Amino acid sequence: MTNKEIESYRNSYKVVNGIGFCRVNNDINGNPRYVVHFLAFTTDEEMRNDNLSQRQLYAIAKKRANYLGFSVYRANWYGGGFVGQSYSLVDTANMINEIVNK
């Protein structure tokens, strides 16, 4: 990454209620989109469970992310993320925390 790309990433990354959001380009309709790492959709207990593989953790996270309207983010620079629309990161973070802690 170049210094310009690093600075751009720093400016587009926000942490809200313990969840990191990375701003990406708007969708085709102009709605703001954010990428969230898949581990934000898992509990600490699930991450510490040695019986769950990374693939199983990802499957759990994907089910929760899809329920909230997120889809798999396929860009190579950000591995293991889900992308969704959000006009309010606080509300989105609260929804993620609510479904994870259900």
Name each model-derived stretch.
Residues R10-S12, C22, A61:
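A residue-level detector for conformationally permissive "hinge/kink" positions
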